[in-house]
Amino acid sequence: MLKKLALLAIIAPALANASWLEERRCSNIYEAGFATGLYSGQCGVSIEATQQKYEPRLAQALNKHNCAQYNEKNIAKLKQNTETLKAKYLKKASAPNFCANYEAEIDKLFRKYE
């Protein structure tokens, strides 16, 4: 019994850290989806085209990392930080020639968290 408790004491921090990392990764995937919508809107790409191209990839990343358990928390976080995130991503999207390369920016965001 003492050995099991000692082992649990060693493993518990690693498990807690893994859970935190998983939650953070899911939060970043949600943010990447938010940025994708902003970038597309800024560059005049239709919502339908954006959804058709990126929704499957976003869903795959969310499923891969088991993000369903963090849905409510991440949606609340996005709502709370909407203005800050808009400022962050629209500033980037206002750069010259951004729209010519916006798909590369979106790919970069997704690759970072997939």
Q: How would you name each of these model-derived features?
A:
Residues 1-8:
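Sec-dependent signal peptide recognition
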Residues 8-18:
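Hydrophobic h-region of N-terminal signal peptides that target proteins for export
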Residues 47-114:
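Compact alpha-helical subdomains of small soluble proteins
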